[in-house]
């Protein structure tokens, strides 16, 4: 739960792609600007609300490097880069986003604080998407547009389900005496309001914590800087909206919510909601099956149970939702690799089969006895219930892998996992395989990178991050302004042309570059190397060039 309360006064986290080829690290640059900066801090941008503010923003020529104009560009508004329903307007090779209130920023990714003047008195101020872009939720018995009027606390009776209301000496205080089977401040919570498992799917109406504190609404202005609020990516998927009901979007132990402490400070607490009893849960009948001595592959590949919304906040450097990249693997060493890189996570990978992980060859200069692969990991410093850990039985490095002038060529390897209790990875919401590509994706396709942002100094984020990048044609990537014929046919380039430096260097060496088609994700590249992080695109191993080798290696070792 560390990320819920992180200090959020940071530029976007940039991570160095590859090994030692990169000219400098933006991690180091950020640290030089702010000595107190740590890579576990995230930025959820917001601005003070100004009704007259021009919410349109144009990316100008000065913000783009010279190489941006070396080739005819596709329509910069396809796909629409404007978030939260913003309209994209083309201006030559650039674009302008016309933002709907209360959003602003060059891509409408920022949420304006429409509650800064505290217009709600004895109530909560909530940010909305319709004029005046806020509304007041009054604390009973206060009422009125600004929660300044008072009504009798027990007339009419605010208590529900036949409960009786008792007035206290203070006119604003009251107690509801709940009948059996009901609880809550207004006796509104029935006995059937319970959660199953860890409560990830809980959609009940409990809004108080175990310490009987009232939950904040998810669209409260106090939560603008938190990782979890109504304006986060996939909010609807996690049951988060304009309410203050408990939820468990990060798959913690049980549902939780934010509460106000003092001076507009917030913290989180677990909620006063119970786990469902066995009789409350209907389990489907299982038909008998024949015993199997061999674990089959997963039912499907490239499918995530975390749906993507069409309206999103910015990706670069933000904490990823648990289960969004279920094929992401963390390669971890039991020994320090260098003086500056301690033991633990050092590279990424992609699960392509229950017993096989795809990674970069330059990540495999380590003995198998010192190597561990962790699947389903979200927080590197926290042992999570959905993690699956395996030792590595064997490393298969591509035979023609080599490094020339510190640039890796044919940078691809396979890790064969050592089974635990007779099986390798088990499919879950947090652990799934990604598909191997069956064709090419065109230049300009928007793809995803993910990882913990490890640099050559060993520094990075404890939380899994993700970013979006676009595929770039090798002809452009080999131009003099970029890599000047350093890119061969085993490599592909990807970056963010509209805003270089924001997403290009995210991810870990060996981590996946995934592209989506018809709701299925394919591992199209492997994070390999790059020069001048943030100024030039990242370079990835092109997986399609090695499909025959991948399939032949797995077949020869697995017998199928």
UniProtKB/Swiss-Prot annotation:
Keyword Metal-binding included in the entry's annotation: no
Tissue: Ubiquitously expressed.
Positions of the record's site feature: Cleavage: 480-481
Keyword Translocase annotated: no
Domain of life: Eukaryota
Result, substituting residue 393 to Q: Variant Marburg II
Pfam families linked: EGF (PF00008), Kringle (PF00051), Trypsin (PF00089)
Sugar attachment sites: 54, 207
Region forming the signal peptide: 1-23
UniProt cross-references to PROSITE patterns, sorted A to Z: EGF_1 (PS00022), EGF_2 (PS01186), EGF_3 (PS50026), KRINGLE_1 (PS00021), KRINGLE_2 (PS50070), TRYPSIN_DOM (PS50240), TRYPSIN_HIS (PS00134), TRYPSIN_SER (PS00135)
Post-translational changes noted in the entry: Proteolytic cleavage at Gly-23 or Met-27 can give rise to the 50 kDa heavy chain (HC) and cleavage at Arg-313 or Lys-319 can give rise to the 27 kDa light chain (LC). The HC can undergo further proteolytic cleavage giving rise to a 26 kDa fragment. The LC can undergo further proteolytic cleavage at Arg-313 leading to a 17-kDa fragment and at Arg-480 leading to a 8-kDa fragment.
UniProt subcellular location: Secreted
Active site: 362, 411, 509
Keywords linked to the UniProt accession: Cleavage on pair of basic residues, Disulfide bond, EGF-like domain, Glycoprotein, Hydrolase, Kringle, Protease, Repeat, Secreted, Serine protease, Signal
Domain EGF-like: start-end pairs: 73-109, 111-148, 150-188
Any coiled-coil regions, as ranges: none
InterPro entries hit by this protein: EGF-like_Ca-bd_dom, EGF-like_dom, Kringle, Kringle-like, Kringle_CS, Kringle_sf, Peptidase_S1_PA, Peptidase_S1_PA_chymotrypsin
Cysteine disulfide links: 77-88, 82-97, 99-108, 115-125, 120-136, 138-147, 154-165, 159-176, 178-187, 194-276, 215-257, 246-271, 301-435, 347-363, 355-424, 447-515, 477-493, 505-533
GO terms (BP aspect): cell adhesion; proteolysis
EC number per UniProt: 3.4.21.-
Disease with which this protein is associated in UniProt: Thyroid cancer, non-medullary, 5: A form of non-medullary thyroid cancer (NMTC), a cancer characterized by tumors originating from the thyroid follicular cells. NMTCs represent approximately 95% of all cases of thyroid cancer and are classified into papillary, follicular, Hurthle cell, and anaplastic neoplasms.
Family: Belongs to the peptidase S1 family.
Identification of the protein by name: Factor VII-activating protease
Record organism: Homo sapiens
The gene coding this protein: HABP2
